[in-house]
């Protein structure tokens, strides 16, 4: 009897817990794609409108200093964060708190931002932190970012082609990123999923080249300085790889060009377009649904 009561209580708690993470109505956010496949959205911070890259690999929200200087009541906190670019450079930034971040009809209060003095064509990056408890869909067919309701997510689940595991990296709710497990030829790797990388970008740590039968002395390579810290840089190698897929081989790339990088802090990091045209990141359930 007691076991049955505990089971019912657990199930009810789980239902309530997950339901709280979905919006009452789905919210559709139009986006534009750059020629390289970057997702560009409009958003406002404390009522100041701007243009941003939606970047699942950014980790944290970023405002350019020029844009931040336009915003009233952007509060500088006592906190800071030291993050690392994929190529290893440490970047330390003070943290600022907004009153409200609004993206179409979706708004969230007290969102944190890093502010960086950088020459950037847009006003900054919107990361996964505003959506860290949501399910959202990147629809490349209709150029829409959809924040799912419980009902719209249910309908997506009824029509999925396949599902993939979603790995989540959350550091104090300041830096949030996602990834999955892939098969790269004979190797099983944990990779970051980075919409900010653009289309058809596949980067791996150079330590895997030997296991893949790639001779670093026989492929194209060059040293590239950091755009953030020009005194630092990495050696890049460019080679053909025969196959990349998810573990169940539902999505795959065959005979593609990949980049191998000395000092990459991940096993791999890549764009998301290889997965499919309509990709749902269900963060509460730690899964990717592909329609």
Residue ranges and their predicted role:
Residues 18-291:
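Pepsin/retropepsin-fold aspartyl endopeptidases
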């Amino acid at each position: 009897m007691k076991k049955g009561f505990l089971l019912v209580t657990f199930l009810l708690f789980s239902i309530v817990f997950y339901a709280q993470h979905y919006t009452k109505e789905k919210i559709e956010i139009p986006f534009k794609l750059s020629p390289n496949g970057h997702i560009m959205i409009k958003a406002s911070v404390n009522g100041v409108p701007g243009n941003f890259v939606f970047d699942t690999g950014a980790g944290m929200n970023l405002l350019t200093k020029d844009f931040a200087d336009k915003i009233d009541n952007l509060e500088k906190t006592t906190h800071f964060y030291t993050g690392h670019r994929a190529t290893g450079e440490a970047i330390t930034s003070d943290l600022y708190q907004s009153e409200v971040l609004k993206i179409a009809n979706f708004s969230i209060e007290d969102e944190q931002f890093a502010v960086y003095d950088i020459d950037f064509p847009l006003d900054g990056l919107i990361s996964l932190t505003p959506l860290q408890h949501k399910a959202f869909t990147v629809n490349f067919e209709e150029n829409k970012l959809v924040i799912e309701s419980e009902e719209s997510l249910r309908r997506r689940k009824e029509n999925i082609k396949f599902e993939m595991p979603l790995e989540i990296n959350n550091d104090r709710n300041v830096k949030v990123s996602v990834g999955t497990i892939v098969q790269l030829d004979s190797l099983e790797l944990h990779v970051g999923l980075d919409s900010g990388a653009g289309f058809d970008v596949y980067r791996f740590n150079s330590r895997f080249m030997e296991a893949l039968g790639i001779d670093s002395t026989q492929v194209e390579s060059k040293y590239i300085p950091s755009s953030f810290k020009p005194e630092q840089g990495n050696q890049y190698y460019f080679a053909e790889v025969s196959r990349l897929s998810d573990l169940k081989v539902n999505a795959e790339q065959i005979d593609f060009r990949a980049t191998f990088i000395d000092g990459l802090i991940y096993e791999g990091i890549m764009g998301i377009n290889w997965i499919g045209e309509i990709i749902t990141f269900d963060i509460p359930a730690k899964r990717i649904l592909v329609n």
